[in-house]
């Protein structure tokens, strides 16, 4: 296995362990066990657990951004985007669990690197939503505000679904889609 492949294996193992145990409860030994390697080898690739955390976040962010690279507001509709985000909760709830773990760590790291990471995650999320919305809403300030609202809705609805399997996320997203489409229609007529 190449050095790059081994590094990726460790990042994938760390992602799984951090999601299951939380960053603070996870150890290098846990990550090494998940990756089926010795703990000493983890330190060959990563200086410490925090460096591994940052590498996991970078990998998660890159994977997410690749989904939307090249999409403009005209190439993907709001219902398609909302459907993809809703189904992510069902298909990959660990993606959101990871997100909440990073949020929790960042909130406690006032002025530190993790707080900046959370700010970057949220900013990237807003931008990835605002850019295509600007094609539909016309007013860039409104597109950015709508992106912030949608991001809060996505995270909040996902949290409700993860902690309560009976939560009707389908109905909530149906209504959210109708609200977004109505807002776009109204803003288009201005």
Give a label for each model feature.
Residues 24-25, 137-144:
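Short, charged helix-capping/linker segments at alpha-helix termini
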Residues 83-90, 99-109, 179, 183:
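Helix-loop "lid/cap" segments that line or gate small-molecule binding pockets
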Residues 58-64:
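Short, basic, alpha-helical segments at the C-terminal edge of helix-turn-helix-like DNA-binding modules
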Residues 1-5, 188-190:
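N-terminal intrinsically disordered/low-complexity leader segments
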């Amino acid at each position: 296995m190449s050095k790059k492949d081994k590094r990726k294996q460790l990042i994938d193992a760390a992602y799984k362990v951090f999601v299951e145990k939380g960053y603070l409860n996870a150890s290098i030994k846990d990550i090494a066990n998940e990756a089926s390697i010795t703990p000493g080898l983890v330190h060959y690739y990563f200086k410490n657990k925090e460096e591994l955390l940052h590498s996991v976040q970078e990998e998660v962010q890159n994977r997410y951004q690749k989904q939307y690279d090249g999409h403009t507001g005209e190439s993907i509709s709001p219902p398609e985007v909302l459907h993809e985000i809703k189904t992510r909760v069902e298909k990959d709830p660990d993606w959101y669990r990871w997100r909440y773990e990073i949020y929790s760590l960042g909130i406690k790291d006032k002025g530190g690197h993790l707080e900046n990471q959370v700010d970057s995650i949220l900013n990237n999320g807003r931008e990835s939503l605002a850019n295509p919305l600007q094609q539909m809403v016309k007013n860039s300030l409104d597109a950015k505000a709508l992106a912030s609202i949608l991001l809060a809705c996505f995270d909040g609805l996902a949290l409700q679904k993860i902690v309560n399997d009976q939560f009707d996320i389908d109905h909530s997203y149906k209504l959210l889609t109708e609200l977004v489409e109505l807002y776009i229609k109204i803003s288009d007529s201005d």
